[in-house]
Amino acid sequence: MSTSPAVETQAADSSAASTPADRTVARLRAAVEQGDHAAIVALFRDDIVFHSPVKFRPFEGLATVGALFAVLMRTFEDFRYVGDLTGDLEGDADSRVLVFRARVGDKQIHGVDMLQFDDEGRIATFTVMIRPQSAATALSEAVFAGLVADGVVPAAQSGGQQ
């Protein structure tokens, strides 16, 4: 099946007009679909800040956020991005919102990943919002257990709002 020159030109124009953030989003989606932890972490800045839906204080730094993502990848079942929104957020950083669906045990999760990028397209801030609350609770408990098992946090630390 061939495409018309107009369609090919439009595709080339949209590809040429893509921003570093657009390219990072495409790489993130591909890495998530492939379950490629290293490729996901390679998209983060060294000083990345990750805001959890269940923890008050953010996770900070590449090593910590990378370890968290290893646990998240084992915890989420049937994770898939189902939408990609663009718009403006306060501040100058380029940003995107990715809508996702997943499961933790028998809990269905609806969520969004809010990403802010640096000028080179690396992810500087990653904020997750999920619903319903029962799914957030199940996710919190499973992730905390995974972080303890991986030695990222001590078992005595509370899994609650810190």
Please describe what each predicted stretch is.
Residues 2-162:
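C-terminal and inter-domain tail/linker signature
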